[in-house]
Amino acid sequence: MSAVIKLKTLQGHLQDLNGFTKPKVQFEQYETPAHIAAVALYTIQTQYGSLQDKLVLDAGCGPGILSIGAVMMGAASVTAIDIDRDALEVLQENIDDLDINNIDTLLCDFLDEKTCRWENYFDTVLMNPPFGTKNNTGIDMRFLQMGLRCTCNSVYSLHKSTTRSHIEKKIKEWGVKGNVIAELRYDLPATYKFHRKQSQDIAVDLWRVYHSDS
């Protein structure tokens, strides 16, 4: 399975995108770095062919780095969902700047049961879900579980490497399959006032979680 464009070219395009103007702590909004997004998308396409000519859902899309990257990797269409109107406005700016016509944006809560109208609809679901703070424990697993309901094939999701054993346990409970397909380093810059360090280096896993019959 080949890539539509080279990894370095993809990363260069993604670095030029607009990001969050005012990240909102209640939504745990952090930028997905261009190098993380590029390596993830390149791996997803070259190893599994899960982007080119596929129907893709970007859950919790933010300013849309995964959505736009998926289109650059040849996705047939992308549905980009986020709960934050401001984030979707930034995504729309990015779409307009690049003259993209196959990304549909939708303002809604991905975890709302109404999302299930897309049961088994998408070929591929992409997500960089909230890690889950003390006040929002388990949201990453709820995202992953909803993603599985929306795809007929695979979910590709970024998670802290420290949660690997927990995810392995959940996958077994849910009766699906999954494995880590890339180990990445996430240089998380200080985004909110309560962050004491200028940046924090976090080990991140790119997971492929999929239905047993896919």
Predicted regions, residues:
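Class I S-adenosyl-L-methionine-dependent methyltransferase catalytic core
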Residues: 2-214
